[in-house]
Each structure stands twice: as structure tokens, then as C-alpha cells.
């Protein structure tokens, strides 16, 4: 009889779902090189490219969003749900799945339902402080529930507890966390050389993700003169938003302060502007303070790296991003400011003062590190593999 393990992982749509999934998949492969690992996703999410690039097989189904109001989509939901669940059953059968691992999102829900109907053990990971509908469904049947937060609002079945394991980190961030723990100064110097910044001076990194954060961009750029009195700046604006930021910086501090990133730009001005940085781990390696949104992935990565941050939650939905940042703020690992309050006056009144107090920044960083978790991918992978050998319940 073959001892090959058969694992199916589910999730996708956004990088927030795909990256943790791939982090766990990579560790499973390291622990079980001969394992058959497949991923269920959609043909339209980021997983379409990222999963095959990572060397894993992608099986696609259609998104089946849960209906939230009585409309045409709600009427069509039962038939679509039945069809996609049947597709998933076929996928699980073909791959001889011994365990299913879901990371939330529309893709996960029919996978949970199909696995439950087939008696296949289920593990789930919830990255947000407030769980989504798919994982709330899966939690009813799961044998193992890992989460980035202690109380994400899941109701497990009897005998199962929600375990705060942290967020499985992208390989680049996991490597950086290890390097910082080993030698923070050397890691900072090496990264600074690649970016063209001075490793011996404070650095603020502003990022709103790949799409940017317009209000954050404007408030910070309009305060450039005040920030540059205390630190260098790397401002990652988001696609198509760098021209406006450069204009605002020029008004605040003059064109001469503007610069670009890279080893050939060492003599540039101290306010470096770019739409995006592929190797954001390099910026994190040099940073003394981050100004950012508070998506679950961002918060988990920054705390894993021990980086103090000013979190400006995206003002949408039910305030999910605020819930993500709150535990870190409670642990004194950073500050949180409402988007509407994050104005140029707020920046000028608070950020220079913080930059002028390295002891406070250091305390924030130490508290962030203490709150952060760096081994989530390993813990999840081992717990998933253990479910295969566990007697059926």
C-alpha cells in the first residue's frame, strides 16, 4: 500500500488568501516531498497564475457567492451551489483527498461542504479578526481550526478549539523575520544598499498596497517637509498615483527632495517615490516606522517582523480592518488612526514627534515582535498532516 499523502487546499481570489495557502503548501511539500498536493481555486483570481508558478496543480471551479438579499442571484444560488459542489466532489475523488485545507473566500465553501459529505477531514485557517461566511460554514465541520487572531468569531464543533497559530508568511517575509532575528543591523545594511538609502538614518515607509491609499498618500505627501526633518521616506503610492504624490511633495518640500529607489540612486533626494516595490521586504528590512492600511496580511507581517506602525484602517464594510489592528494597538505595538482623522495636520502633529523618540519606537517594535507569530506555516502544515493519520471521528 502506498504511503503517499493526498492533500487538497482551497482558497483564492486575493493575495491575502493565496499567499497563506501557498506558504502552507510549500511546508507540506518540504515535510512530505512525495505528497500529491492540489489547489482548488477560480480561473479569475490571483491563484490562476500564482499557484502554477509555485509548482502546484490548480483545479478551478466557479465562484458561488452566498446570497445576501432576495434577488435573481439568490434564486440561482441553489442550482449553482449544487453544480460546483458536484465538481468539487469529482476533484476530491480524483485526487484521493485525505484531508482538505481551506483558507476562506468563495472557493472554500463548496469544498468544505463536499469534503464533509464525503467524510474527509477538514482544516481551516482564518486570517481576519472577523471571520468570513465561508469559514463560518467550514468551522461547523472542521477537525482543526487555525487563526491569526484569538477570537475570530468562529463556532467550532464540540471537541475542537480555535488555535491562534498566526498567519502563514510569504517566503520572503519569513526569511526576513529569520534574518532580522539573527542580525538586524547587517540585514538592514544589506537591504539599504539595494534600495539606495542610508542605513544609519531613520526611515519611514508608506504603503497602501498595490492599489494605494489616496487619503494616506495625500496626508503624508503634504507633510513631506516636516517628515524629512527627522527621517528618510519611501512612499509606495500604488499604481497610477505617484505623479500626484510627487506634486504634493514638491509643494511641501521642493522638487530637490524627490528621489527614486535603487543602488544607482544613492545621491537622490530623501523622499523616494515609487508606485510599487516588488521586493517590499527590502523596505521593511530598513524601516523604523510603517504607515499603512490594516489588512490582515499587513498586520500579521509587520508584527512578525517587529515593525512599529501607524495603521489607518480602510473605512469600508463593518470596520474589519479596525478589528485587525486593534489587538496590536492594545499590545502597544503601534498606533491606529481613523481614515477621516488622518490629515496633514495629524501627520505633522504626531509623526515627527514619534520619529524624534527612538526609545518609544523601539518599545513599539519590541511589543509588535512579541505579539507577532513567525511559524504559522509550519504549525498548520504539521497539524494538517496529523489529521491524515488521525482516526476518523
Swiss-Prot record:
Entry keyword Transferase: yes
Pathway(s): Cell wall biogenesis; peptidoglycan biosynthesis
Principal EC category: transferase
Top-level lineage group: Bacteria
Binding site for UDP-N-acetyl-alpha-D-glucosamine: 14-16, 128, 170, 210, 321
Database matches in InterPro entries: GlcNAc_MurG (IPR006009), Glyco_trans_28_C (IPR007235), GlycoTrans_28_N (IPR004276)
EC number in record: 2.4.1.227
Keyword Transferase: yes
GO CC annotation, single: plasma membrane
GO BP, sorted A to Z: carbohydrate metabolic process; cell division; cell wall organization; lipid glycosylation; peptidoglycan biosynthetic process; regulation of cell shape
Molecular function, one GO term: UDP-N-acetyl-D-glucosamine:N-acetylmuramoyl-L-alanyl-D-glutamyl-meso-2,6-diaminopimelyl-D-alanyl-D-alanine-diphosphoundecaprenol 4-beta-N-acetylglucosaminlytransferase activity
Catalyzed reactions: di-trans,octa-cis-undecaprenyl diphospho-N-acetyl-alpha-D-muramoyl-L-alanyl-D-glutamyl-meso-2,6-diaminopimeloyl-D-alanyl-D-alanine + UDP-N-acetyl-alpha-D-glucosamine = di-trans,octa-cis-undecaprenyl diphospho-[N-acetyl-alpha-D-glucosaminyl-(1->4)]-N-acetyl-alpha-D-muramoyl-L-alanyl-D-glutamyl-meso-2,6-diaminopimeloyl-D-alanyl-D-alanine + UDP + H(+)
Family note: Belongs to the glycosyltransferase 28 family. MurG subfamily.
The name this protein goes by in its record: UDP-N-acetylglucosamine--N-acetylmuramyl-(pentapeptide) pyrophosphoryl-undecaprenol N-acetylglucosamine transferase
Species, as recorded: Bifidobacterium adolescentis (strain ATCC 15703 / DSM 20083 / NCTC 11814 / E194a)
